[in-house]
């Protein structure tokens, strides 16, 4: 393997699982109050956010067209159909209704509108979800937070600003698009979500003190992180004790936070989001200063030889010469085979853990039905919580098997330990209450059968969602066009620029 092109190395504080900023920091100078300082005081940042993506199409044509090409990632296949165990793991939570495989940034707003999890609100005060569900979906979010303040943004229901959040993840999520530097063609990277600035500060990643490589990672942490809704409203990163699986679990346990109570086992559950920043930081690439941008947004050339940053975020192997080959001497096939092997190992272990947790949930329900007491079940439910947290920390990320396969295998192994403890104790409780073991497990071989087993009526939810998409969403888009947040005519096609690796 060649020497890495970057000399900077992230130092990991093992005790806390925190990241050290020292290797990524620039020497600060006397400057006016920073955005981080304002965020820490919960003040408005005083920024201008031009959130309409289409307004940058002409000046930054190469970047814009490559960003727009994320629309080619159209596969929205159901993860619940591929693995019906997920329905049981999330029983009682909206993810058990619909959970699809991720697709391109271009669809961020469309997908959150259409997913069953956001319900079918009839007006701005209706629906099951808070505004927080929009927070990662596009640059209209930091614009609204600046206009309304954090309370004005986070307090309402999800439907309140449906006509305002219409631009999918784009330019102003990462760039200060109104700055002189951006006008001159410089990156002008910026984080304009106050809660993200506070979270970065909590792990020593003060945004203003980061060098350009650190800032490239930090803008991705706007969204590619684990988070929860504090007080069921505010997007919060649970990093106060560190970013590894044990530190975040400890944070949640000590704050007595629960995403939901499981419909079968009654365990106080946690739902991991997508801890990509956290897992990357623990892996070989993160520890050696290789950033998200290096692998997913490399420098490429257009047909005339002009160099620009590829914004069609995707698999690094699709741009092998511009990504992997800048550090590795091995062939593309060799590296692909290695990644495939890691993925298979992690997936196999993950399925084993899923199987055990599913059984634990059903066994716990039988125990409750047989008359088990809260005292008898207390330790069992916490073991189930911890086992599933470890499974989800491994499963919810994008490419965890690549970013840190050793960390994932260790995390899953500790999850297997926790669920083994839960099931051993369940065996004792079941026997005590006269239940023969093993219990009879229901058929969960398909998504439909699994949803029936946990009592979900999808037909009713889908009918309501269809009506919402037919009546409410067109009104949102009409209002957005009137305000200039969307172009008057939606582009009919997507042009992918032809590029060669630099």
Swiss-Prot record:
Residue ranges that the Swiss-Prot or TrEMBL entry lists as coiled coil: none
Pathway: Nitrogen metabolism; nitrate reduction (assimilation)
Reaction catalysis annotation: 6 Fe(III)-[cytochrome c] + NH4(+) + 2 H2O = 6 Fe(II)-[cytochrome c] + nitrite + 8 H(+)
GO function terms (MF aspect): calcium ion binding; heme binding; iron ion binding; nitrite reductase (cytochrome, ammonia-forming) activity
Binding site for heme c 3: 105, 220, 223-224
Residues where Ca(2+) binds: 226-227, 271, 273
Protein's cellular compartments: Periplasm
Record field: transmembrane: none
Pfam families in UniProt: Cytochrom_C552 (PF02335)
Amino acids binding substrate: 227, 274
NCBIfam families listed in its UniProt record: cyto_c552_HCOOH, PRK11125.1
Signal peptide stretch: 1-25
Co-factor remark: Binds 1 Ca(2+) ion per monomer. Binds 5 heme c groups covalently per monomer.
PROSITE patterns: MULTIHEME_CYTC
Keyword Signal: yes
Gene Ontology terms: biological process: anaerobic electron transport chain; nitrate assimilation
Keywords: Calcium, Electron transport, Heme, Iron, Metal-binding, Oxidoreductase, Periplasm, Signal, Transport
Residues annotated as binding heme c 5: 285, 324, 327-328
Species name: Haemophilus ducreyi (strain 35000HP / ATCC 700724)
List of residues binding heme c 4: 292, 295-296, 403
Binding site for heme c 2: 171, 174-175, 311
Predominant subcellular localization, coarse grouping: periplasm
Enzyme Commission numbers on file: 1.7.2.2
GO cellular component: outer membrane-bounded periplasmic space
Full protein name: Cytochrome c-552
Top-rank taxon, per record: Bacteria
Residue sites binding heme per the record: 133, 136-137
């Amino acid at each position: 393997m060649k020497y890495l092109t970057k000399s900077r190395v992230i130092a990991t504080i093992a005790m806390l699982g925190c990241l050290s900023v020292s290797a990524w920091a620039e020497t600060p100078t006397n400057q006016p109050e920073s955005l981080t300082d304002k965020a820490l005081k919960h003040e408005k940042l005083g920024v201008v956010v031009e959130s309409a993506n289409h307004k940058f199409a002409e000046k930054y044509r190469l970047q814009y067209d490559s960003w727009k090409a994320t629309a080619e990632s159209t596969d929205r296949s159901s993860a619940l159909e591929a693995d019906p165990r997920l329905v049981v793991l999330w029983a009682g939570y909206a993810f058990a209704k619909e959970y699809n495989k991720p697709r391109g940034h271009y669809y961020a707003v469309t997908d959150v509108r259409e997913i069953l999890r956001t319900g079918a609100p009839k007006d701005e005060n209706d629906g099951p979800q808070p505004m927080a569900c929009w927070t990662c979906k596009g640059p209209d979010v930091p614009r609204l937070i600046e206009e309304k303040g954090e309370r004005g943004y986070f307090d309402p229901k999800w439907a309140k600003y449906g006509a305002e959040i219409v631009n999918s993840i784009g330019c102003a999520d990462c760039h200060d698009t109104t700055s002189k530097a951006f006008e001159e063609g410089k990156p002008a990277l910026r984080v304009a979500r106050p809660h993200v600035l506070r979270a970065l500060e909590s792990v020593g990643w003060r945004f203003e003190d980061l060098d350009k490589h650190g800032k490239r990672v930090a803008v991705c942490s706007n969204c590619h992180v684990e988070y929860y809704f504090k007080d069921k409203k505010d997007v919060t990163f649970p990093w106060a004790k560190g970013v590894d699986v044990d530190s975040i679990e400890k944070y949640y346990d000590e704050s007595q936070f629960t995403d939901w109570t499981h419909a079968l086992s009654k365990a106080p559950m946690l739902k991991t989001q997508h801890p990509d920043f956290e897992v990357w930081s623990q892996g070989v690439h993160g520890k050696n200063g290789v950033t998200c941008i290096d692998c997913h947004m490399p420098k490429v050339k257009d047909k005339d030889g002009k160099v620009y940053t590829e914004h069609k975020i995707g698999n690094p192997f699709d741009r092998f010469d511009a990504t992997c080959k800048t550090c590795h001497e091995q062939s593309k096939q060799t590296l692909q085979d290695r990644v495939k092997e890691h993925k298979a190992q992690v997936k196999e272990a993950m399925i084993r853990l899923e199987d055990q947790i599913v059984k634990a949930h059903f066994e716990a329900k039988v125990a409750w039905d047989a008359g088990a007491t809260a005292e008898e079940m207390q330790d069992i439910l916490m073991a189930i919580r911890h086992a599933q947290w470890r499974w989800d920390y491994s499963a919810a990320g994008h490419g965890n098997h690549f970013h840190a396969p050793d960390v994932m295998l260790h995390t899953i192994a500790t999850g297997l330990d926790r669920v083994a403890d839960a099931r051993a104790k369940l065996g004792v409780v079941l026997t005590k209450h006269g239940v023969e073991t093993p219990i009879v497990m229901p058929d969960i071989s398909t998504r439909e059968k699994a949803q029936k087993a946990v009592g979900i009526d999808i037909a009713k939810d889908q009918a309501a969602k269809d009506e919402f998409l037919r009546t409410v969403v067109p009104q949102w888009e009409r209002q957005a066009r009137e305000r200039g947040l969307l172009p008057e005519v939606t582009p009919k096609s997507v042009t992918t620029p032809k590029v060669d690796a630099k």
